[in-house]
Amino acid sequence: MTISLARYNFFISLELLKTLVAKGVKYFVLCPGSRSGPLALAAASLSKRKELTLITSIDERSAAFLALGISAASGQVSCVITTSGSAVANLLPAAVEADRSCHPLLFLTADRPLRLKECGANQAVNQQDFLKSVCRHFDESPKEGIHLISKERLTSLVGKSFEMASNIPGPVHINLAYEEPLHPCELDQKKVLDGWVIEGFLKGKITPTKDEVVKSFQSLKLLKLDPFSLGIIIVGPWRGKVKQLNSFRGALKKWQKLTGWPILADPLSGVENDQEGLINHWDLFFSIGLFEKIKEIQVLRLGPIPPSRELQTWLKKPGKFQLLITEGDSRNLDPIGGSTQFSEGFSCWVDKMLEVIPVKPAIDKKIVSKKLIKELIKYDLFIHDWLDKRLFRNGLITEPALARLLPRLLPESIPVMIASSSPIRDWLSYSGEGAFLRRCFGFRGASGIDGTLSMGMGLSIIMGRMVLVTGDLALLHDTNGWLFSKDKNISLIVIMIDNGGGGIFNQLNIDRIEEGDFEDIFLMPQQVCHLTLAKAYGLKYKQVACLDDLEKAIEWSFSLSTNVLIRVCTNSIEDHRLRVNLSDDLKKTLSENLSSFD
């Protein structure tokens, strides 16, 4: 009796997924397709047996960002399964973000066999090359068909791919050719599930492997800073592994206690509010020129640089001895070009530094930095009170006021995802200590608006009840993300800032446009009612008109367990004027009330 090739395809697909599960992959996001049918059947079988968690999505781009959110929150490899053709192209935006943000992500894509390539066959494209430029690793099955793969090759393929996704976390692509027939009959499925094995395919026990990988960089010479001299710490978005974040925080506490250096942290840095030396409104310090009198200083930069233009301008000026430390990522992460990079991680660097620092000198080792941090804290407290009075005095909702008030209205245990463009920049400038009361997530790898809602949904699968702050265009760009609302494990409060399009472009330095309309070519407002759209997806929603309404809407949203939408309308032109006026008025007020530091 001849055994159908479909049974072989199903068997190998099942073995492949079992091997991934044994490695520790728990979450699989499945997109529809015929060529990927054997993988779909295998995933469904393992899901029914509670061996993996299966989530389905009709949109490959949305699916990839959902998986990205799962990986970002858990620190574990998540997997996306797609069919062939343009389906694979839709994975690129999430792959780009996973690469730059260092999140472990695995793409399993079904493909046509070699005989159908380069001959005009339908849906046969060079998909094996679509993601290579941003992936940590690419591998594939035998081009003639996955049914020809051996046990040893399968184990090697999965093992290497998992290691490359986990080592310096990032995206990995495995392309799998499937020869027809693709779909096993019920008898073939039952035979495989009951233990049938391809003759000669050694079915050994698959054992989980510990996360022990060899570092991809060579041991570097210890790059030193003088803890007894003037210095400052700049902490960018967290790019290490989730499980390493606590040791990073511990190392930061050690180094700050030793040096007394002030800390300027990005909202996505993972730094917590109880960190000594944390300066909450540092971005405004740069915008009003408070750092201009500091001519020479050591700068310890941890991770990518925050997106403050004023900070970057200051760092480019002479007199800054800069050391950049990354969490295992040896790629150049210095767009300024003024630093020396150490890639073995901050905890490692601090431990090595503590071994070589001389005995504590007789004088107070913090005396040099004491004056600086004392002055910064004085300014920080003044700005804190000043912003509260300016932003809350009339009860109107503005984007800066929203960034300042929202963190105070949310329980401290509630994580927040902050979308790109205006929201993340306003949190950087105006949220104050609120950004450090909880874990914040966002797109700071490629800073796009692709997949904003879907990533928020993925984060919620791991984090539970959480909040997404997004603009109207970013939300509209990914409305298919609402389709995940059927998943009972997702509980997302979406606060949408509706400013009539791409409000951030009002901040461009364009006096006027010779030909064309600024609104048409930059803002691009859309004639869409988001509340009606929410209703179409079966969501509960609220409209907010003032700051008092916001507090009531937040209380209402937390009384529910489902996904909800809160719409907040703002005026992007007026908010741009407000930001400029805040900077100008603050500079004037400080010059009248406080003495500047040297």
From Swiss-Prot:
GO terms for molecular function: 2-succinyl-5-enolpyruvyl-6-hydroxy-3-cyclohexene-1-carboxylic-acid synthase activity; magnesium ion binding; manganese ion binding; thiamine pyrophosphate binding. It holds the Pfam family TPP_enzyme_N. Disulfide bonds: none annotated. Its EC number is 2.2.1.9. One of its GO terms (biological process) is menaquinone biosynthetic process. The keyword Nucleotidyltransferase does not apply. Pathway: Quinol/quinone metabolism; 1,4-dihydroxy-2-naphthoate biosynthesis; 1,4-dihydroxy-2-naphthoate from chorismate: step 2/7; Cofactor biosynthesis; phylloquinone biosynthesis. Keywords: Magnesium, Manganese, Metal-binding, Thiamine pyrophosphate, Transferase. It catalyses: isochorismate + 2-oxoglutarate + H(+) = 5-enolpyruvoyl-6-hydroxy-2-succinyl-cyclohex-3-ene-1-carboxylate + CO2. It is an enzyme of class 2 (transferase). It comes from the Bacteria. The keyword Transferase applies. Binds 1 thiamine pyrophosphate per subunit. Its cofactor is Mg(2+); Mn(2+); thiamine diphosphate. Catalyzes the thiamine diphosphate-dependent decarboxylation of 2-oxoglutarate and the subsequent addition of the resulting succinic semialdehyde-thiamine pyrophosphate anion to isochorismate to yield 2-succinyl-5-enolpyruvyl-6-hydroxy-3-cyclohexene-1-carboxylate (SEPHCHC). Belongs to the TPP enzyme family. MenD subfamily. Homodimer. This is 2-succinyl-5-enolpyruvyl-6-hydroxy-3-cyclohexene-1-carboxylate synthase. The gene is menD.
